Amino acid sequence: MAANTDPRLQNQVIYSIYVRNHTSEGTFRAVIPDLDRIRALGTDIIWLMPIHPIGVEGKKGTLGCPYANRDYRAVNPAYGTMEDFEALVREIHARGMKCMIDVVYNHTSPDSVLYREHPEYFYRGPDGKPGNKLGDWADVIDLDYSNRGLWQYLTDTLVMWAKLVDGFRCDVASFVPVEFWLQARAAVAAVNPDCVWLAETVHRSYGCLARRHGVYSASDGEVFRAFDLEYEYDVREVFDQYLRGEVPLSRYLDALSFQEACYPANYNKLRFLENHDQPRIASFVRDERALVNYTAMLYFLKGTTLLYAGQEFENDHLPSLFDIDPIDRRTGRDLSGLLRRLYAVKQQFGSADWFFADADDVNDLALLQRGSAGKRFVGVFSLKAKAADVRVDAADGVYENLIDRSAVTVKNGILSCTGEPVILRAEG
């Protein structure tokens, strides 16, 4: 963890918005009327996916990918003006939330302002042409961090935005030198000492692939030196395997236990069921009670919770990044009430809890514990919504299920799970 990371981040919730698809208008100002609803979910930070102009050369789809950035220092005119953006940030702040923007510093679009002004800042392949160090992406070209002039340009850009916003979600942060992030963090701290830094670290297999091809890829442990929290892609592949029925639940929970063993006690992973790069969880989990269990487990896990806009409506369609594809708020159930209750439960947890995970593979039950400073919480999550008797680490007695205030009985060390999620506070 960064030396000055705010421990309160552990129990906060980030809500991710893609401006183009959040409303039918697709503008900064059109987001504003929805802010009260978003705040009421228990949102602490709004993360706006890339707000900058999008490249045209090699673009994907009709409108291009927002991660093919054409100008780091401007806003996408399709979303509005800089004044419109500033108005949105003010309204976010007025509701007690922070605003985080996307930082895409691994690459730009081929027709970017930066490439036009400083072609020397870009990686060139064996043919001498700008391109990609790994893979072949038509809509982006990679930056070359061996040029220190690039470091200064990007750092100055971050300082500019840090005077307006409260944090940065840094795309493919593992492929950018950690020393650059440390320099940038120090410079930003001079104008915004409370800035929140979120790293999109890469999937374990992708990081290994990069290294096999001689491409720099920092480990999650290295990235933590400069960041407050980072993606949980180090365990995501195992989670996806469980969703597809390829491995038992215990494999995923063992991966969570490995995180607990190999990171500092106050490590903070961004926990999510879905994001703009991952399929909607509702497209995998069709049983509504099972989906409630997954959602409750998400909030119980150690780390900051991420909600991707539309998740609260059980959307099963992942919106396109490249075309107009507004969120449909009429699909599935409205989980807003559940999310509010889970947020209230999350506020009871410690900021550097110990965490323990066990599994009942026969019944697909996740048996989790966390605690600190004399507090201990037990969570039972039935990921296939099965009813089963399960042994729990809690004294016999009647407990309050913190999720819905119902009574839960433990007798002879056994809790009778009805298929609904349970979180209780235990002694010791």
Spans of features found by a protein language model:
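Carbohydrate-interacting/catalytic domains
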Residues: M1-W47, P53, E86, R90-I92, ...
